[in-house]
Amino acid sequence: MATQTVEDSSRPKPKRTGAGSLLKPLNSEYGKVAPGWGTTPFMGVAMALFAIFLSIILEIYNSSVLLDGILTN
């Protein structure tokens, strides 16, 4: 047989760290889904604002927005 059993006593225990202790409560919620829409509307607003920001940057880059007092080549 190709499988091998390992006794529990021979396995090293994971080392506890301060960061691990701080992050453990966050990991305990893994796999749980809040009922309803949750924070989806906030994500939609953030995505819309980011799209507006990118379009403004693109318009400035393409010089399709006139900027008074700023010289461009």
UniProtKB/Swiss-Prot annotation:
Post-translational modification: Phosphorylated in both bundle sheath and mesophyll cells, phosphorylation increases when cells are grown under high rather than low light regimes (70 vs 900 umol photons/m-2/s). Double phosphorylation in bundle sheath cells is only seen when cells are grown under high light regimes.
Main location: plastid
GO molecular function: phosphate ion binding
Region (Disordered): 1-23
Pfam assignment, any one: PsbH
Transmembrane segments: 41-61
InterPro entries documented for this protein: PSII_PsbH, PSII_PsbH_sf
Keyword Ligase: no
Residues bearing PTM Phosphothreonine: T3, T5
A cellular component term, taken from the record's GO annotations: chloroplast thylakoid membrane
Topology within the bilayer: Single-pass membrane protein
Record text on subunit structure and interactions: PSII is composed of 1 copy each of membrane proteins PsbA, PsbB, PsbC, PsbD, PsbE, PsbF, PsbH, PsbI, PsbJ, PsbK, PsbL, PsbM, PsbT, PsbX, PsbY, PsbZ, Psb30/Ycf12, at least 3 peripheral proteins of the oxygen-evolving complex and a large number of cofactors. It forms dimeric complexes.
NCBIfam families referenced in this protein's UniProt entry, alphabetically: PRK02624.1
Family: Belongs to the PsbH family.
PANTHER family xref list: PHOTOSYSTEM II REACTION CENTER PROTEIN H
Function of the molecule: One of the components of the core complex of photosystem II (PSII), required for its stability and/or assembly. PSII is a light-driven water:plastoquinone oxidoreductase that uses light energy to abstract electrons from H(2)O, generating O(2) and a proton gradient subsequently used for ATP formation. It consists of a core antenna complex that captures photons, and an electron transfer chain that converts photonic excitation into a charge separation.
Record's protein name: Photosystem II reaction center protein H
Protein source organism: Zea mays (Maize)
Lineage of the species this protein comes from: Eukaryota, Viridiplantae, Streptophyta, Embryophyta, Tracheophyta
UniProt gene name: psbH
